[in-house]
Amino acid sequence: MKIVEKPWGREEWLELNDNYCFKRLIINAGQRTSLQYHHHKLETIYVVEGTAEVLLDDEWKTFVAGDYFTVTPPTVHRMVAKTDLILHEVSTPQVDDVIRLADDHARPDGRIDTEHENA
């Protein structure tokens, strides 16, 4: 398992192959992901534990444990952890296909090499 530290928590990469990627996302309460979209990456996210507020284009939705949602390209999206949050993400394998429109930590688009250094 590869662990990728993020400013908002961490990603645990359980599987990455030519067909799909499976990650566990752990987002700390009060933290949020970047406002982003993808050109090609399609992802379905399942809430394992906690409460998330999710922006999908221009609509905010609340998801709790047992809920899931799918993000199709080029949907603009962001997740906010209302509580400590554990998510499972299954996606197509284009893991570096991230266009950040806004980020609390001024991270650029795509892969952030420093987040992967100790993985």
Go through the PLM ranges and name each one.
Residues 2-6, 78, 82-119:
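Double-stranded beta-helix
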Residues 24, 44, 59-61:
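Short, surface-exposed secondary-structure edge patches
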Residues 1-36, 41:
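A short glycine-rich, His/Asp/Glu-containing loop-to-beta-strand
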